[in-house]
Regions:
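An amphipathic alpha-helix/helix-turn recognition signal
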Residues: 39-40, 151
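Hydrophobic h-region of N-terminal signal peptides that target proteins for export
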Residues: 8-17
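Electron-transfer interface patches adjacent to heme c in soluble/periplasmic c-type cytochromes
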Residues: 18-39, 49-126, 136-137, 162-262
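Solvent-exposed, charged amphipathic helical/linker segments at domain boundaries
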Residues: 138-155
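Hydrophobic, well-structured mid-protein blocks that either form specific transmembrane helices
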Residues: 127-131, 143-144
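Sec-dependent signal peptide recognition
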Residues: 1-7
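Secondary-shell segments that build the walls of catalytic and ion/ligand-binding clefts
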Residues: 159
Length: 262
């Protein structure tokens, strides 16, 4: 009898999980129509063209990897190695570089409010929305050939499985097994191409539950916070490497963001 009850319970849980998954997908499709992310894209375009900083220049000569000022398809090619900075950069790290070198602003000024909220979105978030949106429909192809790109991806892979902090958590603790959820939120297994493609193709994103636009640097930072470890420096080698590993694993996906998240 106990065996029968256990089988019934497991079957019910499985059915519930499948139904919940369908409802979550339906919900995402509904909120994708007329996404508020479009408003952040528009604001980001304004900021891209706005003269700022001690040098009073815009970001229109910022080289995101496709040449000075070229935003079309740039996000799809990130993270990648930049010779002028001699390091691998993701979108936000590169924007920070351009703000400091082209506009003459300080790192402290730019990163003071790198992450905004519903009432006060950050400049970095809006710029990320604009640049990312210019890769819509383009296949994701982050840099993977330069020696420092290869090092970055391997570092990201090692960090993904590295346990740390008081709770002895790693990224794989939550994102390591199929079918895991936190409440109604599915936890994709990001070291597998299928899940990584879905993630790479939709970030950055508008977060419905907080009415705010969030970026991958924010996502990495918040994961470290939830693991009860010190939050990383904005644009650190650690966060860029993790983003690079996930992006490289998900290479080939057609970018369809900025997306919508719970």
């Amino acid at each position: 009898m106990r065996t029968v009850l256990l089988v019934l319970a497991l079957s019910a849980a499985s059915a519930y999980g499948q139904d919940a998954g369908k409802e979550i997908q339906r919900y995402r499709e509904m909120v994708a129509e007329g996404s508020p992310a479009e408003l952040f894209e528009l604001e980001g375009e304004t900021l891209w063209k706005k003269p700022q900083g001690p040098k009073n220049v815009s970001l229109e000569k910022c080289n995101l990897g496709k040449g000075p000022g070229v935003v079309k398809g740039a996000y799809a090619g990130l993270p990648r190695y930049f010779k002028d900075a001699d390091r691998v950069m993701d979108l936000e790290t590169r924007l920070l570089y351009c703000m400091t070198t082209l506009q003459g602003r300080t790192r402290e000024e730019v990163t003071k409010r790198a992450f905004g909220n519903a009432d006060h979105p950050s400049e970095m978030e809006s710029l990320s929305a604009y640049v990312a949106g210019q890769s819509r429909g383009i296949k994701m192809a982050p840099g993977v050939s330069h020696p420092k790109e290869k090092q970055s991806i391997e570092l990201g892979r090692a960090l993904y499985f590295h346990r740390v902090g008081a709770w002895d958590f790693s990224c794989a603790t939550c994102h390591g097994d199929e079918g895991k959820r936190i409440r109604m939120q599915e936890l994709p297994v990001l070291y597998k191409p299928a899940a990584a493609r879905s993630t790479a193709a939709t970030w950055p994103a508008y977060r419905v539950s907080t009415s705010s636009f969030v970026t991958l640097q924010w996502r990495m930072n918040d994961c470290f916070r939830q693991m009860r470890t010190p939050e990383p420096t904005f644009g650190s080698e650690t966060t860029v490497a993790l983003i690079h590993f996930i992006s490289a694993t998900g290479a080939g996906a057609t970018y369809n963001g900025p997306g919508n998240k719970r």
